[in-house]
Amino acid sequence: MKWLSRSYMAIIFLILYAPIIVVMLFSFNASGSLSHFAGFSLQWYRELFRDGEALTALKNSLFLAVVSSLLATVLGTFAAFSIYRSRSKRYQRVMESVSNIPMMNPDIVTGVSMMLLFVGLTAILKFNDILGLGTMIIAHTTFNLPYVILSVLPKFRQMDKNLTEAALDLGCTPAQTFLRVELPSILPGVVSGLMMGFTLSLDDFVISHFVSSPDFKTLPLYIYNQTAHEVKFSMYALCTLIIIAILALLIMVNVAGSVGERRQKRSSKKVGARK
């Protein structure tokens, strides 16, 4: 049975990672042809960094991902804190369910509804065109919020309440207790939510397609426009760089989570020893 289990897992991993491996491999292909591999070359990476439109789209995507993920992390952390501190279990269940709905909602429905909202605001406020960077930030922050809440709320519930009580007994104000005790305890969840929001924002195409303007194009929109006509090998290089960046983010999240858990365990042991 072991060989069957291992064979099954090998097939699953092959299906999952074969497309990624092919993209990364052909990003170094010297021939510029999909029919054969003529050797390793960095020419497509050089061509990519000479493409001004691609670099502009990359800058737009990075700026949008950073701003929207930071906003979503701040708002989502305080939303999770509010849910956690509520004394009503019914309120907590309702708010959790409401915050989970956008994650189950199809992206195309979210994109169309946001577009209609922004177009309606354009008519009400009598603006010529409201779509652009502002609407992109609002949209990306909105769909990132539930993921931040989902990451942070369990950390609040796993937090050792003895640490909070000890800080209050020692004279800390509620604000100081949150910043010095509770925030370090939930930091792995906050970082996970931030990285998840950054990745989702960087990757988003459907919602961005409906709320963007011709003057502000993100990387997924640029790649789609390019592949709609002819697949350039520089796009393989671009996809490879994105894959490497996301892999680095995942490693950072895992490391931050492990470090945070070890710190929390050490703090709990110290409080227990003092008691």
Q: Which functions belong to the PLM regions below?
A:
Residues 18-52, 117, 209-214, 267:
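Short membrane-interfacial helix/loop motifs at transmembrane-helix boundaries
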Residues 45-54, 202-252, 256-259:
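Interhelical loop and adjacent transmembrane-helix boundary motif
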Residues 2-3, 67-99, 119-120, 178, ...:
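Transmembrane-helix boundary motif in ABC transporter permease subunits
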Residues 1-8, 12-15, 153-168, 174, ...:
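C-terminal transmembrane helix and the adjacent membrane-cytosol boundary/short C-terminal tail
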Residues 33-35, 42, 108-141, 175, ...:
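Membrane-interfacial helix termini and adjacent extracytoplasmic/periplasmic loops
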Residues 21-32, 189-224:
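Non-cytoplasmic
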Residues 129-168, 176-182, 192-194, 205:
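Membrane-cytosol interface at the C-terminal ends of specific transmembrane alpha-helices
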Residues 33-66, 88, 228-230:
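Periplasmic/extracellular loop-to-transmembrane helix junction in inner-membrane transport proteins
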